Amino acid sequence: MKKLLMIGVLALTMGQASAQRCLPKMQGIEVCGAFVDGKPLSAAFSGGVVLSTYTKNGSKWVFGGEYLQRDYNYSDTTIPVAQFTAEGGYYKQLLTDASKTLFVYGGVSALAGYESVNWGKTLLSDGATLQDRDAFIYGGALTLNIEVYLSDRLALMGNVWERCLWGNDTGHFHTQYGVGLKLIIN
């Protein structure tokens, strides 16, 4: 009996247990906000929601939607350019620590959506006419994503994206950097 008790105590006290994170088919909901093109939040911002599903090697598939708005100064007013995009992509796990608390991913995504220039109004208050029009947009994004787990089900994220979109008249490249929260749902 003494021997069995000693084996039990050793089994419970030896080694270090770490959380079960990034297991295959585990899913999380990510909510992110970001600065766009180095502009202040009052002039350019984005926000999005993403569903991520982990694969057997710790990488993840992501599917979600995003809203991006950038205001362009014109005379004494601003002209808003808004993009509504859907994203689907794959993020490869590049680095993790032994305790599975910190993860670094590099990813590539396909994007498709719609861009609205001045909410469809082509005539400005001073009588000028906008040449840029609303359009369907498509393209891709490169992403660097860092996750730090605060608990087994909650992670703080940092992201840097470079989006390249075609089909619009207002610029093809947008750099975004932001933060977000991830909640593991299963």
Where are these regions (language model features)?
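Residues that define the transmembrane beta-barrel architecture of outer-membrane proteins
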Residues: 25-27, 41-47, 78-86, 102, ...
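Extracellular loop and loop/strand-boundary signature of outer-membrane beta-barrel proteins
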Residues: 35-37, 73-79, 126-132, 164-168
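Outer-envelope beta-barrel architecture signal
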Residues: 20-29, 57-61, 100-106, 134-136, ...
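Predominantly the C-terminal beta-signal and adjacent terminal strand-loop region
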Residues: 68-70, 145-186
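Gram-negative (and chloroplast) outer-membrane scaffold detector with strong preference
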Residues: 52-125, 183-186
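Cleavable N-terminal export/targeting peptides
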Residues: 1-26
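Short glycine/proline- and aromatic-enriched beta-strand/turn motifs that initiate or cap beta-hairpins
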Residues: 19-70, 182-186
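Membrane-embedded beta-strand positions of outer-membrane beta-barrel proteins
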Residues: 27-33, 47, 61-65, 88, ...
